[in-house]
């Protein structure tokens, strides 16, 4: 394990933690730094005409970062390193350059063959123009029923080809999902075409067209649209919805210092990159003046969307939306009051396009607070529930939304007042669709969601990457299962047969740590520090991973998607921490064959017996949903949530939210006093009051009606 400095957390308040600078080594590259990186590369290689695929921060080694953070000396501050992925026409593979921005020099450039770069917006937009002009594509459109003079009504969603043995990974290839619109505002997904062009991205031409053995002509049904004008034309009007306003008259409860945010005892760094999108680092909790580290880094590191139709070419449909396109590159500029509601703080994102120019996504990250419902409550039945305490919570939400062709992914990192950290993903957008004939047997691989529209079965599997730092660098993972107690009913040890307990298993090695969710045992995973025990329970301090939306990868072992997305074969993997091991499907995902599998399975195979007990570890968790489409998902899918929790267990002495002011608190002695003064009726009415803005739905405000009343 790398040497890390001693953690001084337990002796400092947040405001005095070292590293409280406005500029931090984990900050994303600024617009000026991106420009500088491009200038340095061009200066070093003036005769080259590179296309810039990626320019991003190379995060400093963990040990170096922590040494700087706790040394209080800027002399130890890690240098700013930019990682650039460059493309050169006629040169296979990619060029990977490392640029020292602090010293303004290229420190390394490496030519890597046998890999393909991420697909950028520049590449994708170009593809649609290429297919529209291709004679063979025009011919197939006409055969499908598209009028010859309406090629400008033909659209495509360009995807990476996934993997196709005809092309391997020596050329950068795309496949085009084809559609038709009768006008530019139509939803193309209600009129899919049945053929799939293959495009050589480098030569910018169509090299083949995959044509099904059974043709499916263009549907003559009207488009199924969802814009307001279309719904009003169909229904006559939109439904009446009275607005809900969110106000914070005293301002927000968080404060920003550079890219660091402090909120209700939490403190963390908010990063962002082209691939993972939001990255949260250096997460700690102020436990009554003791600053306790929780996680060094957390992110959604990869995802895969495998489709379930085995017919060619649909086996290629298993998008790695992060590794092949990038959640950062695909991120939306967020709109006030629409994507986020309330009192908002935004962070922009900066990227470099293929010509080396800096582009900015305004409002890429939304930071705001939401009402979190009842935080805790208890009432006493002895006085008809008049003795009561009830507190309402708020929650901090750090979010982004990215669009991957037809789908939208809404990513929410949510922090609760009781110390819980939640990751919520919401899936919306439009189903990927394919043409079908009237009355066609879909063989169970899909559902007709609209006349002649086939939506294939698919999954959305995400990989959460956690590098814990719970009260120190040496952590373990315990698999916790609920089990029935020993002994049958009537036995001495379990006479009534009702006994149950937990079975706690701590894997020692990487190989032993591979496991899956078990709903029968309510399985959870305690990420813990075995060196620090709770003074009451005697159990290790921990954060429990609670995740129940964990479908297995439906594709069979040995399938193309199983080989390429090896991280998705199991729900939990644990590996020793190593700098640079971030992406579980490998650094370069497009057009990998899966033979051998890159990323996480590769690292596990290298060191299957490496220790993951009481050391610096990374926890990889695959979760998601299996989606069998239905007509209610079309033409625009209602948002479907997926949630998981990181819940403190044996971490705090007691409920850490008890210092949140209650909305209502009446003690037994106060009830007795009110009874003595004849004010019980007024007390009962007071139980409805939570704040000055609350009111009755069909009457006047309570606080106005009883203004001046004295309750005790």
UniProtKB/Swiss-Prot annotation:
The modification 2',4',5'-topaquinone is found at residue 407. Changing residue 458 to A: Impairs copper amine oxidase activity. SUPFAM superfamilies: Amine oxidase catalytic domain, Amine oxidase N-terminal region. Its cofactor is Cu cation; Zn(2+); L-topaquinone; Mn(2+). It holds the Pfam family Cu_amine_oxid. GO terms for biological process: amine catabolic process; amine metabolic process; cellular detoxification; intracellular copper ion homeostasis. Its EC number is 1.4.3.21. The keyword Oxidoreductase applies. It comes from the Eukaryota. The active site is at residues 321, 407. It is found in: Cytoplasm. Keywords: Copper, Cytoplasm, Disulfide bond, Manganese, Metal-binding, Oxidoreductase, TPQ. Mn(2+) binds at residues 616-617. Substrate binds at residues 319-330, 404-409. PROSITE patterns: COPPER_AMINE_OXID_1, COPPER_AMINE_OXID_2. GO terms for molecular function: copper ion binding; primary methylamine oxidase activity; quinone binding. It catalyses: a primary methyl amine + O2 + H2O = an aldehyde + H2O2 + NH4(+). One of its GO terms (cellular component) is cytoplasm. Disulfide bonds join 340-366. Binds 1 copper ion per subunit. Can also use zinc ion as cofactor. Changing residue 456 to A: Decreases copper amine oxidase activity. Changing residue 627 to A: Impairs copper amine oxidase activity. Belongs to the copper/topaquinone oxidase family. Homodimer. This is Copper amine oxidase 1. It comes from Schizosaccharomyces pombe (strain 972 / ATCC 24843) (Fission yeast).
């Amino acid at each position: 394990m790398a040497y890390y400095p001693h953690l001084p957390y337990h002796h400092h308040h947040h405001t005095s933690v070292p590293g409280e600078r406005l500029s931090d080594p984990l900050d994303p590259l600024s617009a000026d730094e991106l420009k500088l990186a491009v200038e340095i590369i061009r200066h070093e290689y003036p005769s080259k005409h590179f296309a810039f695929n990626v320019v991003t921060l190379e995060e400093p080694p963990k040990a170096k970062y922590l040494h700087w953070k706790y040394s209080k000396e800027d002399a130890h501050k890690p240098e700013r390193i930019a990682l650039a992925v460059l493309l050169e026409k006629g040169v296979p593979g990619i060029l990977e350059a490392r640029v020292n921005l602090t010293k303004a020099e290229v420190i390394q450039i490496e030519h890597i063959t046998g890999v393909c770069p991420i697909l950028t917006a520049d590449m994708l937009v170009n593809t649609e123009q290429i297919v529209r002009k291709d004679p063979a594509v025009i011919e197939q459109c006409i055969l499908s029923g598209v009028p010859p003079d309406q090629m400008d009504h033909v659209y495509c969603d360009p995807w990476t080809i996934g993997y196709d043995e005809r092309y391997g990974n020596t050329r950068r290839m795309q496949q085009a999902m084809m559609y038709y619109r009768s006008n530019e505002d139509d939803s193309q997904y209600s009129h899919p075409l049945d053929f799939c062009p293959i495009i050589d991205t480098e030569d910018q031409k169509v090299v083949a067209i995959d044509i099904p053995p059974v043709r499916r002509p263009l549907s003559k049904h009207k488009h199924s649209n969802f814009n307001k004008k279309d719904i009003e034309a169909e229904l006559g009007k939109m439904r009446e919805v009275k607005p809900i306003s969110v106000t914070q008259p005293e301002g927000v409860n968080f404060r920003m210092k550079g890219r660091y945010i402090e909120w209700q005892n939490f403190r963390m760094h908010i990063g962002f990159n082209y691939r993972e999108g939001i990255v949260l680092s250096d997460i700690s909790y102020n436990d009554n003046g003791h600053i306790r580290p929780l996680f060094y880094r957390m992110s959604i590191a990869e995802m895969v969307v495998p489709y379930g139709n085995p017919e060619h070419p649909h086996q290629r449909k298993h998008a790695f939306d992060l590794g092949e396109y990038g959640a950062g590159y695909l991120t939306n500029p967020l709109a006030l009051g629409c994507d986020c509601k309330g009192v908002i703080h935004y962070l922009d994102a900066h990227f470099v396009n293929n010509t080396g120019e800096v582009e900015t996504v305004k409002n890429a990250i939304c930071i705001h607070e939401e009402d979190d419902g009842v935080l805790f409550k208890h009432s006493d039945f002895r006085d008809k529930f008049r003795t009561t305490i009830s507190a309402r919570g708020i929650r901090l939400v750090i979010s982004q939304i990215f669009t991957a062709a037809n789908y939208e992914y809404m990513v929410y990192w949510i922090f609760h007042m009781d110390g819980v950290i939640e990751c919520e993903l919401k899936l919306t957008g439009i189903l990927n669709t394919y043409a079908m004939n009237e009355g066609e047997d879909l063989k169970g691989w899909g559902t007709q969601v609209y006349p002649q529209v086939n939506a294939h079965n698919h999954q959305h599997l995400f990989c959460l990457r956690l590098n814990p730092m719970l009260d120190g660098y040496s952590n373990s993972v315990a698999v916790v299962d609920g089990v029935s107690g020993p002994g049958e009913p009537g036995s001495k040890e379990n006479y009534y047969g009702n006994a149950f307990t937990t079975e706690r298993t701590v894997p020692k090695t990487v190989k032993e740590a591979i496991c899956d969710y078990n709903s029968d045992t309510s399985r959870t995973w305690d990420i813990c520090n075995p060196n620090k025990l709770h003074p009451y329970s005697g159990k290790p301090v921990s954060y429990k991973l609670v995740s129940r939306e964990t479908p297995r990868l439906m594709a069979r072992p040995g399938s193309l998607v199983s080989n390429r997305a090896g991280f998705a074969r199991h729900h939990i993997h644990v590996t020793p921490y190593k700098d640079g091991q971030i992406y579980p499907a490998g650094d370069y995902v497009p057009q990998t064959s899966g033979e051998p599998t890159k990323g996480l399975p590769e690292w596990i195979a290298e060191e299957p017996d490496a220790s993951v007990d009481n050391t610096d570890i990374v926890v990889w968790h695959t979760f998601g949903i299996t989606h069998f489409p239905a007509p209610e998902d079309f033409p625009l899918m209602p948002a479907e949530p997926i949630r998981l929790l990181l819940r403190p267990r044996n971490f705090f002495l007691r409920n850490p939210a008890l210092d949140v002011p209650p909305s209502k608190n009446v003690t037994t002695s106060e009830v007795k006093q009110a009874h003595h003064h004849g004010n019980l009726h007024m007390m009962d009415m007071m139980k409805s009051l939570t704040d000055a803005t609350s009111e009755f739905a069909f009457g006047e405000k309570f606080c106005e009606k009883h203004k001046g009343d004295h309750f005790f």
